[in-house]
């Protein structure tokens, strides 16, 4: 009895096997690419967070040093404002001894008078109190795209300064790295109880604001 040879066409099976193989490779490749993309995004997110944290730390240190008199110049505190009064009680403000750039820009003669006027009424003096007029601290261009930091400065009737800093101009409570700096004033008074010297140098460390 002769054997009947049956020729089977395996090309279809080969094509199916090939398609399954490429499908598996495609899935694996997709998983690898997705994992790489996720890893790259995670790495970029980490870098972004580091940059934001660095921007905040730098701004906080700058404000603490320049407004708080932390940087002593020639062995003396760098934020000292002197006030004199004439016979009519009119005040004159001497800011010549201010050495820090932010100190010089903040403690102008007119602003000093406004702060003391608010103090006389038992009120806070606030600079940058709303989202539309926040102080803005821009990092130098060579800093590589660091985020700007927004600030608000409050001087209370005891002349203590509170600086609030945020990466969000609206000061959202959940904004990362919100920071508060408290700077203590050491004022001097004359015999009539009037402020004659406003001096800073005992600032407390900057603290991250708890949400």
PLM features: residue spans?
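Conserved functional hotspots that engage anionic ligands or polymers and/or phospholipid headgroups
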Residues: 2-4, 13-17, 65-211
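Alpha-helix boundary/capping detector
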Residues: 32, 45, 58, 69-70, ...
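Aliphatic-rich helix starts adjacent to a transmembrane/signal segment
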Residues: 4-6, 10, 16-55
């Amino acid at each position: 009895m002769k054997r009947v040879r049956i020729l089977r066409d395996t090309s279809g099976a080969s094509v199916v096997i090939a398609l399954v193989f490429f499908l598996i490779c495609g899935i694996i490749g997709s998983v690898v690419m997705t994992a790489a993309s996720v890893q790259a995004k995670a790495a970029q997110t980490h870098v972004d967070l580091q940059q934001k944290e660095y921007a905040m730390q730098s701004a906080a240190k700058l404000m603490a040093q320049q407004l708080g008199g932390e940087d002593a110049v020639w062995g003396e505190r760098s934020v000292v404002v002197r006030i004199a009064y004439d016979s009519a009680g009119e005040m004159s403000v001497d800011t010549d001894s201010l050495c820090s750039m932010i100190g010089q820009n903040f403690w102008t003669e007119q602003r000093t008078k406004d702060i003391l006027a608010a103090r006389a009424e038992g009120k806070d003096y606030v600079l940058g109190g709303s989202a539309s007029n926040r102080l803005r601290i821009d990092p130098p261009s060579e800093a590589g795209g660091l985020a700007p930091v927004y600030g608000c400065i409050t001087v209370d009737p005891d002349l203590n300064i509170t600086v609030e800093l945020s990466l969000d101009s609206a000061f959202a409570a959940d904004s990362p790295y919100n920071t508060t700096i408290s700077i203590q004033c050491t004022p001097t008074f004359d015999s009539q109880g009037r402020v004659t010297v406003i001096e800073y140098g005992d600032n407390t460390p900057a603290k991250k604001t708890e949400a």
